């Protein structure tokens, strides 16, 4: 038994043996203790029967008496205890022998059973051995027959081999002849190959020379291609900038026309109001003729003009019109209303109500006729409503000065100077166009018309240049969203420079337009995206008139409820990372102008007329988006 590698049953047997040894040791210890106890008791109390209690009491009495008498008798051995020990030992030996006999009987039975099993196995093995010998005899007979058959086959194969060997000898002689012929042909082919190799070397030298020439030509072609791409990108960028500037100018002009139209309507309404006031004043004067006249002093004060920024892409009017209150005050007192009520006009998101300003002027004129008490005009009244995102013109005769802490002041309040003021205050207008437009205002309208003709020619040339490709894209798109249009008829490798220029234009446009969700548009789209002529004609007006001086404005293409402007760029999914936003031009920031009264002159009127001619090639669209007035410029086809 290997003690280092023990199996589970071996370990169990060892543990059982150890357990038996421990139990035997405990039994021996108990037996030894019992033997010593019995000997001690027998030696001391051997003459008494321990099972009888009376005898035990007598024994104890005698021991006590002996102690008292101090007389000790010698202890003698008792033969009864010895006999009991011998009997006990015999009983133990008998039990042990009986257990050994039972174990021997069980072992004998097991051996008998094993012998019987071995006898049966031997009988089976002998029977199987007879069967195996019979099968082996049959197999031997079969193999002998097969051996005879194979011998006959070997004889046949030997005969065939002799025939084949003779044939192989003949074939070998033929192959020798053929090999000699092939050697001769190979020598000839090697000589020809050497000649062809020399020719190939010469041709390779020529090919290398041609490749060097071709590489030089390719480098020159690549340089020319890069130059062409750069020039094309610059031209496209300039064209896009010119288009953007023209659209912005057209939007400003459209905004100013709407404002002048609103002012005219309000002037008519205020004329009616003045007539009513004059009638009320005449009635009051006739009633006061019988009274004693009172001399009243009249004080007037001049106010510097208000100069605010005239451009904001998103503008809304938040004005509380109090015509009824003004009329009641004027009819009750015979005097104009307080300056605070007349001057408190709202200015929010770059648009203010011109009706309140005109009402203020007319009520001031009526107060001078009625010899009312002097009232000083406070500059604080102009600060009652905050100015947000730039300013807009609100008055035509008496401009009011805005506080110096307002965001921007770059245009006068006269509508005759709206073109130049919108140019100077626009954050995206070109300084070159600004100088030209201001110069035309000082010189003559003919220069402005020639500039407009140049812009229109450039715009239509760029448009007709890409019309064919836009028509193909239109046929492919159908009623779905228009795909990305390549605005340059060049190869596909020019897409990098074109994409850079278009992304720059897109970044500029994204500053000044509200991007709405792009919806599928009609198939009759223009080369620059959606055909906005249909949108401008079919868009329904927004009913919110409290934010705009003209209630008839159409829905904005930039609003969330209408399709967005399709800029000449590729889709956002194909665009990749957007390019960095280019820095603003130094001439785009609005400049602070002097707060001096500006009157309407002939040169400014001519510049306004020229600006109207300039924007004649684009369709305006004044929109209302999210409660804010937005006026955008839409390209039209000529």
From Swiss-Prot:
Phosphoserine carried by residues: 285, 481, 488, 522, 526, 559, 562, 567, 591
Tissue spec. comment: Predominantly expressed in skin, also detectable in spleen and lung (at protein level). Very low levels, if any, in brain (at protein level).
Main location: other
Compositionally biased residues, Low complexity: 401-430, 467-477
Coiled coil stretches, renumbered: 87-284
Entry's Gene Ontology cellular component terms: cytoplasm; FAR/SIN/STRIPAK complex; lamellipodium; stress fiber
Subcellular locations according to the entry: Cell projection, Lamellipodium; Cytoplasm, Cytoskeleton, Stress fiber
Positions of region (Disordered): 280-303, 360-430, 463-490, 514-621
Compositionally skewed regions (Polar residues) per UniProt: 360-371, 514-528, 589-620
GO biological process: negative regulation of transmembrane transport
Keyword Phosphoprotein: yes
GO molecular function annotations of the record: protein phosphatase 2A binding
PTM-bearing positions, type Phosphothreonine: 569, 589
Keyword Membrane found: no
Source species, domain of life: Eukaryota
Keyword terms, alphabetized: Cell projection, Coiled coil, Cytoplasm, Cytoskeleton, Phosphoprotein
Quaternary assembly: Interacts with CTTN/cortactin; this interaction may redistribute CTTN to stress fibers. May form homomers. Associates with the core of STRIPAK complexes composed of PP2A catalytic and scaffolding subunits, the striatins (PP2A regulatory subunits), the striatin-associated proteins MOB4, STRIP1 and STRIP2, PDCD10 and members of the STE20 kinases, such as STK24 and STK26.
Protein task: Regulates lamellipodial actin dynamics in a CTTN-dependent manner. Associates with core striatin-interacting phosphatase and kinase (STRIPAK) complex to form CTTNBP2NL-STRIPAK complexes. STRIPAK complexes have critical roles in protein (de)phosphorylation and are regulators of multiple signaling pathways including Hippo, MAPK, nuclear receptor and cytoskeleton remodeling. Different types of STRIPAK complexes are involved in a variety of biological processes such as cell growth, differentiation, apoptosis, metabolism and immune regulation.
PANTHER family attached to this UniProt entry: CTTNBP2 N-TERMINAL-LIKE PROTEIN (PTHR23166:SF9), FILAMIN/GPBP-INTERACTING PROTEIN (PTHR23166)
Protein name: CTTNBP2 N-terminal-like protein
């Amino acid at each position: 038994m290997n003690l280092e590698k023990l199996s589970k049953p071996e370990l169990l047997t060892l543990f059982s043996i150890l357990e038996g040894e421990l139990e035997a040791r405990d039994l021996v210890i108990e037996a030894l203790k019992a033997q010593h106890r019995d000997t001690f008791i027998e030696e001391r109390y051997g003459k008494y029967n321990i099972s009888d209690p009376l005898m035990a009491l007598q024994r104890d009495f005698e021991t006590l008496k002996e102690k008292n008498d101090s007389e000790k008798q010698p202890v003698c051995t008792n033969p009864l205890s010895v006999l009991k020990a011998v009997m006990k030992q015999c009983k133990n030996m008998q039990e042990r022998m009986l257990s050994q006999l039972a174990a021997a009987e069980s072992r004998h039975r097991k051996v008998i059973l094993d012998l019987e099993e071995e006898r049966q196995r031997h009988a089976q093995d002998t029977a199987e051995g007879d069967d195996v010998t019979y099968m082996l005899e049959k197999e031997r007979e079969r193999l002998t027959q097969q051996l005879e058959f194979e011998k006959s086959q070997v004889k046949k194969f030997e005969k065939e081999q002799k025939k084949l060997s003779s044939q192989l000898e003949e074939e070998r002689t033929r192959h020798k002849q053929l090999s000699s012929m092939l050697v001769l042909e190979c020598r000839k082919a090697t000589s020809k190959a050497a000649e062809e190799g020399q020719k190939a070397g010469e041709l390779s030298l020529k090919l290398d020379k041609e490749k060097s020439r071709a590489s030089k030509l390719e480098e020159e072609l690549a340089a020319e291609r890069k130059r062409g791409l750069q020039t094309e990108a610059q031209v496209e960028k300039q064209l896009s900038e010119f288009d953007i500037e023209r659209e912005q100018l057209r939007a400003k002009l459209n905004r100013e026309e709407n404002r002048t139209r609103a002012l005219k309507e309000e002037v008519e309404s205020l004329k009616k109001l003045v007539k009513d006031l004059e009638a009320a004043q005449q009635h009051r004067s006739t009633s006061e003729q019988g009274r004693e006249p009172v001399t009243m002093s009249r004080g007037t004060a001049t106010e510097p003009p208000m100069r605010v920024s005239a451009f904001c892409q998103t503008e809304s009017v938040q004005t509380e019109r109090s015509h009824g209150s003004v009329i009641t005050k004027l009819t009750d007192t015979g005097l104009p209303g307080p300056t605070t009520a007349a001057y408190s006009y709202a200015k929010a998101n770059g648009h203010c109500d011109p009706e309140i300003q005109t009402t203020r002027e007319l009520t001031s004129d009526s107060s001078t006729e009625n010899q009312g008490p002097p009232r000083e005009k406070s500059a604080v009244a102009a600060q009652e409503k905050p100015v947000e995102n730039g300013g807009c013109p609100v008055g035509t005769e008496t401009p009011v000065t805005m506080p110096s802490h307002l965001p921007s002041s770059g245009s006068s309040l006269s509508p005759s100077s709206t073109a130049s003021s919108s140019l100077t205050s626009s954050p995206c207008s070109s300084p070159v166009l600004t100088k030209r437009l201001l110069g035309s205002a000082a010189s003559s309208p003919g220069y402005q018309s020639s500039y407009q003709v140049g812009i229109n020619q450039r715009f239509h040339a760029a448009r007709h240049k890409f019309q064919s490709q836009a028509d193909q894209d239109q046929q492919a798109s159908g009623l779905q969203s228009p795909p990305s249009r390549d605005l340059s008829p060049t190869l596909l490798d020019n897409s990098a420079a074109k994409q850079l220029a278009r992304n720059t234009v897109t970044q500029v446009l994204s500053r000044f337009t509200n991007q709405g969700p792009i919806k599928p548009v009609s198939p009759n789209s223009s080369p620059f995206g959606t055909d906005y002529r249909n949108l401008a004609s079919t868009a329904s007006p927004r009913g919110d008139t409290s934010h705009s001086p003209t209630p008839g404005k159409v829905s904005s293409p930039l609003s969330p409820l209408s399709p967005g402007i399709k800029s000449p760029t590729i889709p956002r999914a194909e665009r990749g990372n957007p390019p960095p936003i280019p820095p603003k031009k130094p001439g785009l920031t609005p400049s602070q102008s002097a707060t001096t009264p500006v009157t309407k002159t002939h040169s400014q009127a001519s510049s306004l007329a020229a600006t109207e001619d300039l924007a004649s090639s684009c369709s305006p669209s004044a929109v209302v988006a999210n409660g804010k007035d937005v006026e955008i410029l839409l390209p039209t086809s000529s």
